[in-house]
Amino acid sequence: NPNAKTFDISRLGFDDVTLEKFKELVGKPTGLILLTGPTGSGKTTAIYAAIGFILEKHGNAVAISSVEDPVEQNLDWVNQSSLNPARGYTYPAALRSLMRQDPEVIMVGEIRDEETAEIAINAGMTGHLVISTIHSGSTSGTFARLINMDIEPFLLASTIMGVLGVRLLRTNCMHCATPYTPEAYALEQLRQFEGEEYLQMLIDQQGFYKGAGCSACSNTGFARVTHSVLDHLSKEHEIISFGINYQGDPHDYPFKIYPASTHNP
């Protein structure tokens, strides 16, 4: 297929720990894996890479189907379909059709409503591996979002295998990056996330830089988007059980989810 594109899971920018956990998750035979993050953060790319990893392991022996809005890249050995709401081909309708075909792996472009969520969770409970995205303010807030869709907490507890949050940051322009001193609160946050030893290493050996703006970057101070910041929750995390049962504001969770990795190719 000349329009097919290969996505390499090892080039997503995940650190070794997160990459192995992600591979472990997509290697499971059943359950629901969710990716969350803003538009353009790389969620779909990560899912395509996950499907590529499954195909690399099993070839076309595993039946994979997708419902997308729209299909962003053609994938070999994957039965892909695009939504067509004008003709009634919505996420719920498409998923019901897919369930009759009995695929082993199902990619759902996005869980947007209660009906889609119910079908995806039911598929994850009945012998399918479902990989999808959902818009949420945070990784832990994914559970509150699904509960607000009237999904029963016990269903989430038994179905969700893991949640991966993805963010992309812009890198400094290499032509105008100059040394600078971050504000005290930023240094304190870095100290809390990474520890005093890591912070001191940055100060002593690398320093901090900020793009001043030049003609090469159209005076923005930034280059291209290449820096990924990730956090993840897996079935083993205590916070999954807590998040499912938490009734308060997701932004007030007493747990803090710190980035699992940062990568700058």
Model feature map: region roles:
Residues N1-P265:
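Short, flexible helix-loop junctions that flank or precede catalytic/ligand sites
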